[in-house]
Amino acid sequence: MGLQKKTDPEQAQADSAASRHTPMMQQYLRIKADHPDTLLFYRMGDFYELFHDDAEKAARLLDITLTARGASNGVPIRMAGIPFHSADQYLARLVKLGESVAICEQIGDPATSKGPVERKVVRIVTPGTLTDAALLPDKADTFLMAVHQQTTRRGVSKTGLAWLNLASGELRLMECEAAQLGRELERIRPAELLYADGIELPALACARTRLPEWHFDQDAGTRRLREQLGVASLDPFGCAGLGAALGAAGALLNYAATTQGQSLRHVQGVKVERESEYVGLDSATRRNLELTETLRGGESPTLFSLLDTCCTAMGSRALRHWLHHPLRDPALPQARQQAIGVLIDQGTDALRTALRRLADVERITSRLALLNARPRDLSSLRDTLRALPDVQACIRDDQGSTLLAQSLHDLAVPQDCLDLLVRAVAEEPATVVRDGGVIARGYDAGLDELRDISENCGQFLIDLETRERARTGIANLRVEFNRVHGFYIEVTNGQADKVPDDYRRRQTLKNAERYITPELKAFEDKALSAQDRALAREKQLYDGLLQALLPHIGELQRVAGALARLDVLTALAERAQTLDWSAPERVAENVVDIVQGRHPVVEGQLAAESVAFIANDCQLNEARKLLLITGPNMGGKSTFMRQTALIVLLACVGAYVPARRAVIGPIDRIFTRIGAADDLAGGRSTFMVEMTEAAGILHHATPASLVLMDEIGRGTSTFDGLALAWAIARHLLSHNRSHTLFATHYFELTQLPQEFPQAANVHLSAVEHGDGIVFLHAVQDGPASQSYGLQVAQLAGVPQPVIRAARKHLAWLEQQSADATPTPQLDLFAAPPTPDDDEDDFGAAPSAVPAPLAPTLAPEQAALVDALANLDPDTLTPRAALEALYRLKALAGEALDAA
């Protein structure tokens, strides 16, 4: 990213080397020297050309032709080019690959230039600074972020974050502990990250740009932000005490302004975020709940894809933001729910019809502020402002909803802006200014006059053709125009003897001659000059129009925010009505009480197959803090846990929820430990990932947290896993005291309520039918009677010989267990009979939970049993399931041989 120019000695050396090249290549090399780390799109006529290493890289990334033409300094010039008119599609591909591109345009006039036409870089396209509609995803925001770490005089290290959505002008700051950086990056998901040397960044799939440390100077950052906002103090914005974040903001704003080649007029405010504002969601929770992305990386089915019936792209982006930022303070969520209720009562059809006609005001406004709005941006903006009264009319009465009242107020039409657009912009303007027809008639008298001259050409040519036919007697004489030869009179060879003496030959064809006359030549000069002058005048007027619209940026941003908010509320109202959701009740008591709750996404998937979803209750309170959930795989344990978390999250967002009734108390964080996956890139095994996530929960969960623990301890040996699961559940009850859903196949844990009355057993039941099994998916009190592992394995397609061998061995194991006499040595959780160890780390004697007996098995048989016990069909991909089948078949063969 060429933000720094070469020093004087370096530049002198570069100039000396450049002097041995052609003038055009000298110009290219000078510009390229200022942007060494970016691809340079060098405009030459109707193409952007790339040279040398840039050409090779672009040819490889874009699959375009690499050629070599001519030579400069005795070296063939490697080059690759793309058409100017299709540059956006190539830019989109490069940006997606994390590349930055400097756009170098011709700013001089080729007709008057001596030597190479003057060129300069007008903007730099990077992954985090996109504003063009063709380069941006419609329904997701693109953020540029700067990260800066600072150590205070007391030795306390703070990490400052500043991030900017250049396509909307939204700027945010926050400071956090270094350990929280990964969680914040996962929440914000920047497209590009700016950082200085010395900072440790967690793994994140985004472009990274390193800047010198001095770019992050706190004092310079403070001055830069004050200058950007036009204020003398940042205290009213809540920036007092922020040091590292202000340094990051300075680097961010300077970088963004440099890429755009101008000031950021639409960045007119800053919001300081505090960790205490939002319900904490770590990366594992966002992934496991599939808020906006499935576990396999898809866009659907997710909570966002289910809820996104928004009518505008602005609304979809706002909905995505709401889902990733549930609020701790219930005031705003309750205001949203009140507005949704009003919209349901009034009906949303008319409002949704009105919203569908609106353009993306948010992004058009940003392009307008950056002076790169296109003609159809302005016509779309005009039509949207015209339609605002229709939107307001669809809300008959806000019925006391402060949010709807505020939205209606913010939708006030910026009349001066609308009047200017109506007067200045043609009803259906051309796509680009250079094609003409953008400025409306009547806006400028000079332009109208030039257009009249140009547009009256047709009548003049008809009149001239009629007169010349009469004068010459040539009945098939034609007067026409083309871009190469201009105006001409065409006469066929058979009529050549009738051509008058004042005709001058302009072009010879196979069967005709083309001529020019003094009268036609004079008209040509006048008409072509008028057309060129009209286009030049129109470009001048268009640039002036953009400048005249700049004072209205704030009003347009206000309108965009109101439209996005109203669109989300309308979509949530439609979803609540269509899907039969209810308004949750928010209370001060520490409680999660859900009656007939459903998983929103799974219910939608089942409905598509005409299958009813089984609703379930979930009660968590001070007397019932942890639910031990047992039952078979595929019985619905994970679905029950996830639906509880999603209902709580939706309540904190301000949406209605998929339940007959829901009472939700204060929630500060939602944690999930669900599923099994290793982290090969990070060098962590499945069990290590599991324990790392569990450690994070145990360190940070509070009594106001909701914790989901699924199959903890399964990644290691049976006794290790059981011991860990027991200790973790006990710690959550005695120390964290969080609302906890704890799913397990360790039936020994079901005795935990004997020690902790705040724990309760529930199970998801199933019924055996012959050799098969029917899952009831209903949550019932008490522990499950068995796991139905063999039946699930049979459903998964495990070969029958394996199932028969496993069933035979299971019967033997159960008989051995029944015949065995328990001894103290086999009591896994009993305290050793020594007076020094009669208390555990929690200050209380451990509960005596009987452990399973361990019969003696042949190694081959033990391997088969362990493989079956550790099999979790809920988490298997089709490929993994197939591999598991082959592995089980091989183990079964070995077990049968051993028997």
Swiss-Prot record:
Family annotation (PROSITE patterns)? DNA_MISMATCH_REPAIR_2
Recorded GO terms, molecular function?
A: ATP binding; ATP-dependent DNA damage sensor activity; damaged DNA binding; mismatched DNA binding
According to the UniProt entry, which residue ranges have a biased composition of type Low complexity? 843-852
One family from Pfam that matches here is MutS_I
What GO terms in the biological process aspect are recorded for it? mismatch repair
| Keyword field | ATP-binding, DNA damage, DNA repair, DNA-binding, Nucleotide-binding
Gene3D superfamilies according to UniProt: 1.10.1420.10, 6.10.140.430, DNA repair protein MutS, domain I, MutS, connector domain, P-loop containing nucleotide triphosphate hydrolases
Disordered: annotated segments? 1-20, 832-852
**What InterPro entries does the record point to?**
DNA_mismatch_repair_MutS (IPR005748), DNA_mismatch_repair_MutS-lik_N (IPR007695), DNA_mismatch_repair_MutS/MSH (IPR017261), DNA_mismatch_repair_MutS_C (IPR000432), DNA_mismatch_repair_MutS_clamp (IPR007861), DNA_mismatch_repair_MutS_core (IPR007696), DNA_mismatch_repair_MutS_N (IPR016151), DNA_mismatch_repair_MutS_sf (IPR036187)
Q: Which residues are listed for ATP binding in this entry? A: G631, P632, N633, M634, G635, G636, K637, S638
Q: Superkingdom of this entry's organism?
A: Bacteria
GO cellular-component term (any): cytosol
Its biological purpose: This protein is involved in the repair of mismatches in DNA. It is possible that it carries out the mismatch recognition step. This protein has a weak ATPase activity.
> PANTHER family, from UniProt?
DNA MISMATCH REPAIR PROTEIN MSH1, MITOCHONDRIAL, DNA MISMATCH REPAIR PROTEIN MUTS FAMILY MEMBER
Give the family this protein belongs to, as stated in its UniProt record: Belongs to the DNA mismatch repair MutS family.
In Swiss-Prot or TrEMBL terms, this protein is called DNA mismatch repair protein MutS
List the gene name.
Answer: mutS
